[in-house]
Amino acid sequence: MKFGNGCWLQKEGIECFAPQEAYFVNKNDHEVVICAPTHHIAHRGDTLGGINLTIRVTAPAEGVIRVQTSHYLGVEDHSPKFDLNMDENRAMDVEETEDEIFVRSGNLSLRINKKNWSMSYERDGKVLTASSGRDLAYMRTQWTGFAYDMDPEGKAYMCQQLGIDVNEHVYGLGERFGALVRNGQSVDIWNEDGGTSTDQSYKKS
C-alpha cells in the first residue's frame, strides 16, 4: 500500500506520524521499550497532545534483532496470524548514553539516535541498512485532525522503509507472478496460505 504522492507529499487524506525522539526508555537485559512521541518535546505543554508510539526491541535469537512498533495496545487483534517459536526472554546487550541506545545480539547491532530519531542496523561495525525521518511511521487515512478524529471510516497502518545501497536487490516476498527482483514494487503481505483451489492462490500482486 502506498501512502505518498511522490517523495514530498502524502496522498490526500493521509497523515503521517513518525517518531522524533526517545522521550523515555525502559530497559533490562532482554528488552528495550521506548516511548517515542511524533513531535519534539520542548516543555511540558508539548506532552498534552499528539501521538506517541511504543517501540519494543528484543533479540529472539543470536544475530537477530526484532523491532515492534505499536500505538494504543490493548485492543483485541482479529488479524490472521500464527504463534512464533522464539525465546521472548533471551538476553541481549544493551547500552544507553545521553544521545544513543545500542542493542547487540551476536554480531548484529542496532543503534538508535534518541534526540533526532533514527535507527541503524550494523554487523561487525558495517552499516547494513538504516531508517530515519518518516521511514518508520504510524499512518492514518481520511485524517481530519485531532479535534475530529472520530471518523469510523478512517484506518490506521504501520509503515517501515529501510534503505538499500546501489546494486542491492530484494527477492522473494511470496510466490507471485511478476519479476523475481522486487525493487520498486509495492507488495502486500499476509499470513494466509492460499490452497490449490481457492480464489487466493498465488495470483495476488
What are these model-derived regions, one by one?
Residues 1-4, 15, 47-49, 70-72, ...:
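Catalytic and substrate-binding clefts that recognize carbohydrates or anionic sugar/phosphate headgroups
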Residues 3-43, 49-99:
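A low-complexity, Ser/Thr/Gly/Pro-enriched, surface-exposed linker/loop concept
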